[in-house]
């Protein structure tokens, strides 16, 4: 099969013919229909988080099940599935507490990649998916069956960008109606945090970004206010918008140190900062612990929106079908696999909400 292989950090991906092993017990092979370009893929491919090469990235996908291994019960050949990176056993401590994103179990696919080059060289199945390729082999816990009626490019976003942003609001923070919410970063994840806040009934939803274009886009997704952090005093504007109280919730959806450092100063008393974006290895953020303790403020981490994919993805699809969740509008442009480096470059320039590779 064809795949876009990363052989050197920070360099263009290389289109190669690679070999994919047959699915084993509890696994399946999925023919990828669409896979989105996520900033996490770019950060990994740039070497921001280390890792081993060669590797195939891509983790935000949808496709058709073509083969199943022994014991697979949740899906059948021909099903359309959203493919996520969340691999879970269902019975460890993390899973038992309703947090499959923190599953502690090691799987055969974790120990040995199903991917090899034509010369027999092992290729890392990055982010437990490796969907910058025509096919993937994944564990059955990683997929959710959906209708084939949803556009593939739109459906692929449910695998990461949507559940991460929306879920940070609804699952991790559990934002209450009437809350004042600030979302730092108006990219794909940030826009879905905005949508989560809107659906949750937030009183004000403030989108903060360096791009006026993205701020205007955020308003179409539900933001009530926009602040360009390169032109305005964010803390002052947030105080004005919230009648001098500050924000009940601040969601940091980008990986910039300045975004983390500035977020705590936007909080109201008893307010909560939710860390969603992922900085490069070694980046540290500074807080004022005395103020946070005195004001009963909180910091939460949110991985993949604390998602339970078998519950959350069907719920998100229901909101989409009701017209309460925008998916189609998140897709900026579609590309074929051979154009993947062009798609990545556009994301790096800030020219896209989500670019999607279609097969």
Regions found by a protein language model. Name each.
Residues 91-184:
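NAD(P)H dinucleotide-binding glycine-rich loop of Rossmann-like/cofactor-binding domains
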Residues 80-81, 141-142, 147-232, 236, ...:
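Mid-domain Rossmann-like dinucleotide-binding core that forms the NAD(H)/NADP(H) cofactor-binding site
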Residues 271-272, 297:
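Glycine-centered, small-residue-biased loops immediately flanking beta-strands
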Residues 21-35, 46-96, 101, 147-149:
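Glycine-rich beta-strand-centered segment in the early N-terminal region that forms part
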Residues 2, 14-19, 31, 62-64, ...:
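Residues located in well-ordered beta-strands
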Residues 261-265, 269, 310-359:
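C-terminal hydrophobic helical "lid"/dimerization subdomain
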